[in-house]
Each structure stands twice: as C-alpha cells, then as structure tokens.
Amino acid sequence: MTAHVRPTDAKKLIKGATGNWEVVIGMEIHAQVSSNAKLFSGASTAFGGPPNDHVSLVDAAMPGMLPVINKECVAQAVRTGLGLRAQINLRSTFDRKNYFYPDLPQGYQISQYKSPIVGEGEVIVDLLDGESFVVGIERLHLEQDAGKSIHDLSPTLSFVDLNRSGVALMEIVSRPDLRSSEEARAYVTKLRSILRYLGTCDGDMEKGNLRADVNVSVRRPGEPLGTRCEIKNVNSIRFIGQAIEVEARRQIEILEDGGVIDQETRLFDPNKGETRSMRSKEEAHDYRYFPDPDLLPLVLHADFVEELKSHLPELPDEKKARFIADYGLSPYDASVLVAERDTADYFEQVAKGRDGKAAANFVINELFGRLNKDGKDVITSPVSPAQVAAIVDLIGEGVISSKIAKDLFEIVYTEGGDPRVLVEERGLKQVTDTGAIEKVVDEIIAANPDKVAQVQAKPTMLGWFVGQAMKASGGKANPQALNDILKRKLGI
C-alpha cells in the first residue's frame, strides 16, 4: 500500500499568537482480543474476578513455564487485519520487550517488533459534515498485557493483581494522518465499530478493553513534522479529544515563547484539563528487543487466512453502502444506523417489508432519542423491532398521525403492549371523516375572525389554524384532509 500525504486543511488549523499551526496526530490503539483464554496460557480472561484469581503459572512467570500460543488469538488478529484491508503476513515473530515493573512478572513483555502479524491497511472515516478521509494503518501486532498495580489500598504498601497479565492485546498503529481532535475521535469510533462487527474486541473502554496512546505534534503549515509527545493510556473517546486539544495548545505556547518541545510520554488529567510529564519518551533501543527464544516463528497457511476471510461479516462500510442503495437512505442516516452492529440489525428488522426511509426516520428520531435520554441502547430497549414496525405501519396506513405516533410510542415504551390493540383501546385512530373535520374548522374560523383576515393577507399563518384544529381534535385529524379543508374555507 502506498503512503499518502494529506494536504493542509485551512479549516483545521489552530490559531496561535504568531500565526496558524497544524496539529499532527497518530494513534496506537491497544485492543484486548476477545478470547476465553490468554495469549500464551489457558487462564481465563473474564473481567472483574477476585485479584489474582485468573493467573496461571505461565502468567506468574514461574521458573520453567513455557508459553504456548493461543490459536484463537491468532485468528482474531488475522480477522482484524482483514477487516482493516491490511496485508496479512504469513510469517511473523515474537520478541521480548525488556523493562522492569512490579506488574510485569517476567521482566519483559512478549510482543512483535520486527515482524508483525499484520502489515499496512487503512480505515475510511466519515465526519458528521459528510467529509470522508483515509487513515493509514502502519501495522497490527500481538502482545501481552501487563498486570495491574494498586496503590490506594494502603498508605505504605502497593499491591499487584495479575488477572490481566498475559491477556492478548492487538496494538493497532496508525500513520500520523489525523489533523484535529474531531478526526481522532471519529477514527477511534470507526475503528471500535469495525472491531465490534468482527467480534475481535468488545471495545468497552470503561473496562480497559480499548486504550489509546495518542501521539501529538504541531508544526507550521507545510513544514516538516514537529517533535511528538505521547499521551499514554487515554481511556475514553471524549478524553482523547480533550487531551489532544490541551496538548496541542501547550506545545504551541512553548514554541511561540521560543522554547523547544521535549520528546516525552505524558498523562492526561481530565479533572485539571491538562497533560503532565510522566517520563522521557523511550526509543526502541531502550527496550533491548530480541527474538523470544521460547517461541518459534508464527507461520500461517494461506488456506487458514482464506477460510477466515470467507466467514467475515458484512462490515460498516459495506453495510452503509447497502442501506443507501436498498433503502434509499441518506449517507448521514445510514452512518448513524451502521455505527453499531446491534443498531443496524435492529433497524433491518424494523425495515423488513416496509418503507426503509420511514423506518429509519422513526428509529433515529423517536427510538434513539428516547433511548439516549434514558441511557439505554437497542439491546436494553423496552420496545422490540416488531413493535416499532407496527407503529411505522400504522402511520403509513393512515390509521394514526405522526403526532399520535409519538404518543403511542411513549405508551409502548413505558407500558408495553401491541400498538394496534392500543390504538383501538385508547381511541387513537386519526379522524378521516371530512364532516367532523369541517365542523372543527368552522368553529375555529368563527371564533377567530381577526386571524382569518391575517391569514388571507399572510398565508404562512395557516400553521396557526392547523395547530388549533389539531389541538381541538386531540391530534387525531388527518393532516392532509385538514390542510385541504382549511385552505378551501379560508380561500388561500
């Protein structure tokens, strides 16, 4: 895959005291592999167990214990590489990354330095304004996670929990192709969506399933790359955006004051809204990488890769294109619906056999709006796809108006029930009897002669009469019939 260079976008430049600056961002995403067992042992990867409950002798680095590769972790890495349109390397190797820390019992981390399992790929990212851009993927490699040091249980002691030690991670390294905090957030959101579609990572940042190291530098437009600082272990998409903004501003202020940027690793403090120095940024030679003598090169057969490829699910980009073609959706609506696999599946159940646009409008505007208000998603939704589909059908058949549909949806959401039965039981059918509608209109016209004169001079005031008639009919008047009668009676 050929490298590409993004042209400077004037809209994304940051204004400094002495002129404009361009921020350049690269990401290293640590995605926990969805697997029942760890990368080199059979210990469980279950989240939330008692401390040191999921630790094998291999994880604890007991003498004489040798690592054995977990085939499912390898398969998950290959699936991810295929989903990123990346090169799958049939031969890769494991290396020891040497550093000392209490929660790293081996004294080194098994990783892939020289020969990763996945090479160059790409992610296509869509922004809310309709802009799309490509983020190049430099590599994906497998590595072990470390344990967890706990410092707040005692004023004098630190504790180590090795439950996470040895859990398989995929480190997905992007090229420095991002040019704003908005782009970085959109990239991580899209990457997480791809991983979830593939089933290779849960992407739950609250549980540490997905963590980001964010590399930030600034430069004058058109100049060479500046010195980068790495912001370590950012654990939410919102914090990623905030960390980039404050770090870019920090670097700009230093450079404009005549200072220089030190290449270092920093931490983001969301409470103070600042980054602070953690340590000088290590280079590869600081880790003294060398091939792990306990692990043979990982050699894959092409048939193995092809078998995995043949069973890949439909991914967000392909699903979005299909939704646009098959259901006539706008690119924006299609993007919203395919952002999560569960959401896309829910929509397709609603849209099956009926107007796709009408289904999308109701799902996005009514269902998602209500779920977001309550902090729920389609998995925990109290309204089933069949119930939403029934409401969409009732609107399409002219049985209820769009306004009544909102009220009906609220009843189904809070109380449950069959929408068609509820319409009958609660008298929610819209009034299509033109005689009844004319009676309501006549009463409103008779009571408001001043408004009649105004609407005849200014036809846009018709909406006031529509609102009064809808109010008088309890929202049940057929909108088209009502509009026709009003225009005829008012002579407009």
From Swiss-Prot:
State the EC number(s): 6.3.5.-
The keyword Lyase appears for this protein = no
Its UniProt entry gives the catalysed reaction(s) as:
L-glutamyl-tRNA(Gln) + L-glutamine + ATP + H2O = L-glutaminyl-tRNA(Gln) + L-glutamate + ADP + phosphate + H(+); L-aspartyl-tRNA(Asn) + L-glutamine + ATP + H2O = L-asparaginyl-tRNA(Asn) + L-glutamate + ADP + phosphate + 2 H(+)
Major enzyme class = ligase
Q: Which SMART domains match?
A: GatB_Yqey
> Alphabetically, which GO biological process terms does the record hold?
glutaminyl-tRNAGln biosynthesis via transamidation; translation
Which Gene Ontology terms cover its molecular function? asparaginyl-tRNA synthase (glutamine-hydrolyzing) activity; ATP binding; glutaminyl-tRNA synthase (glutamine-hydrolyzing) activity
Q: Which UniProt keywords apply?
A: ATP-binding, Ligase, Nucleotide-binding, Protein biosynthesis
Organism superkingdom: Bacteria
> Which NCBIfam families does the record cross-reference, listed alphabetically?
gatB, PRK05477.1-2, PRK05477.1-4, PRK05477.1-5
Q: How does it assemble?
A: Heterotrimer of A, B and C subunits.
Q: Return the PANTHER family for the record.
A: GLUTAMYL-TRNA GLN AMIDOTRANSFERASE SUBUNIT B MITOCHONDRIAL AND PROKARYOTIC PET112-RELATED, GLUTAMYL-TRNA(GLN) AMIDOTRANSFERASE SUBUNIT B, MITOCHONDRIAL
The record's similarity note reads:
Belongs to the GatB/GatE family. GatB subfamily.
**What's this protein's function?**
Allows the formation of correctly charged Asn-tRNA(Asn) or Gln-tRNA(Gln) through the transamidation of misacylated Asp-tRNA(Asn) or Glu-tRNA(Gln) in organisms which lack either or both of asparaginyl-tRNA or glutaminyl-tRNA synthetases. The reaction takes place in the presence of glutamine and ATP through an activated phospho-Asp-tRNA(Asn) or phospho-Glu-tRNA(Gln).
The protein's name is: Aspartyl/glutamyl-tRNA(Asn/Gln) amidotransferase subunit B
What is the organism field in this record? Azorhizobium caulinodans (strain ATCC 43989 / DSM 5975 / JCM 20966 / LMG 6465 / NBRC 14845 / NCIMB 13405 / ORS 571)
